[in-house]
Regions:
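Long, histidine/aromatic-enriched segments associated with O2/redox biology
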Residues: 3, 8-25, 30-397
Length: 397
């Protein structure tokens, strides 16, 4: 590769990326394979989509120069997401060109329930792209809470990418493909690979503390008032159909947790470890009766479920949609296990929902066994409506 060609690849890749991305598309990108999640829609897939087993959460710093290159970046992300989620065989780029695909998934890429969900951070709305007056009304950098131990290198970012699918190689393939086609326009800031455990023995899957996680979720009928952003929420018109994403990398101090009695663990969560039932119930779907237990005899007043969701009329509006994944990073520098939960939540208003809940959880007993170390707040873009649309089109005007 010549010096000019190499520099074009590393720094100015976007000049021809849009055409290359389209050239790599199968003959019919919209003809989804049987295991494909539809890409086009009012909302992005990957928010209310049935949760897949594997995930990668990645945050990027955007290094594209000017609004034109930023637009090219969003067009490229759209082309790649449309291709990857549909599956099929990529068209060859030519006999002297590099292969159109890494080949990790074989000659015919399966759809594999892959979803690609794109969000933007508050830092994108600075003077670089002239978007200062386009920032979503409720988007801020992630707040640091009293019990956090945040590592700046694991926080924030201009752009978030959530990749979810049935198999690990599918999400890894998707990340590799996106990184290849956006090189020179954005660079990885931090990344967490997640997995969702099988229900054991049934019902909601468990986190790495052994407790069922994500039992209570907003009803689909409530998504318009709890999950999706609309023009009636004081937001810019371009955000309609989007959402707010909160990501939190929560390390679990499992060596210490495993020394705690089951009874004490259950009192901290407010649920039975075996069944997931609230401590005053018998099944995981039972609704705790706080009115009948005002002093916390059955479910301690300091328990996680009681503080997170007091189930009052005043706190009903703070519910959010959870879509978290377990993670395992091996060991840290001193040999301790580095594992935990990549907490992911979607909502209409971060302050009203996630931050209100997190404030209620301050100093709960569980904080001795968990350590939030990273994450970020992102505005999830509206969906790509059709083949002529692209991510960020309404934002960029």
């Amino acid at each position: 590769m010549t010096g000019v060609g190499r520099r074009s690849f590393l720094r100015g890749a976007l000049a021809g990326t849009g055409a290359a991305a389209v050239a790599g598309l199968p003959a019919s990108a919209d003809s989804a394979t049987p295991a494909a999640v539809p890409f086009h829609g009012v909302h992005q897939a990957g928010v209310t989509t049935a949760q897949q087993k594997q995930a990668i959460f990645a945050s990027f710093d955007v290094i594209a120069v000017g609004k034109h290159e930023l637009t090219d970046l969003f067009r490229t992300l759209t082309d790649r997401a449309r291709l990857l989620t549909a599956g099929g065989a990529p068209a060859p780029l030519g006999i002297t060109a590099p292969p159109a695909d890494s080949g990790v998934l074989g000659p015919d890429m399966p759809g594999d329930d892959l979803t690609v969900t794109v969000g933007v951070g508050a830092s994108l709305f600075d003077e670089r792209y002239g978007l200062e007056d386009r920032k979503p009304a409720k988007l801020t950098p992630m707040k640091e809470f009293p019990d956090d131990s945040l590592d700046e290198s694991l926080c924030h970012g201009d752009l978030s990418l959530q990749l979810c699918a049935s198999e690990t190689d599918t999400v890894l393939h998707a990340l590799r493909d996106v990184a290849r086609h956006t090189r020179g326009a954005m660079q990885l800031r931090w990344r967490v690979d997640g997995f969702r455990s099988l229900p054991r023995p049934a019902g909601t899957p468990r986190n790495l503390m052994g407790f069922k996680d994500g039992i209570v979720q907003p009803a689909p009928a409530d998504h318009d008032k709890l999950v999706w952003v609309g023009t009636g929420n004081g937001e810019p018109a371009w955000t309609e159909g989007g959402s707010y994403q909160v990501l939190r990398q929560i390390r679990m101090l499992v060596e210490f947790w495993d020394r705690v009695s089951v009874g004490e663990q259950e009192n901290m969560f407010g649920r039975r470890r075996d069944s997931g039932a609230p401590l005053d119930g018998s099944t995981e779907t039972d609704r705790p009766d706080y009115a009948a237990d005002p002093t916390g005899t059955a479910i301690p007043l300091t328990s996680h479920i009681r503080r997170a969701n007091p189930r009052t009329a005043e706190t009903a509006a703070s519910q959010f949609l959870r879509r978290g994944y377990n993670y395992d990073k091996g060991t840290d520098a001193v040999g301790d296990l580095d594992m935990g939960l990549l907490f992911c939540a979607y909502q209409q208003d971060i302050a009203r929902q996630f931050e209100a809940v997190q404030t209620r959880l301050a100093n709960e007993p569980l904080v001795d066994y968990i350590r939030p170390v990273g994450g970020g707040y992102f505005s999830v873009l509206p969906g790509v409506r059709d083949g002529d649309d692209h991510f960020g089109r309404s934002l960029l005007g």
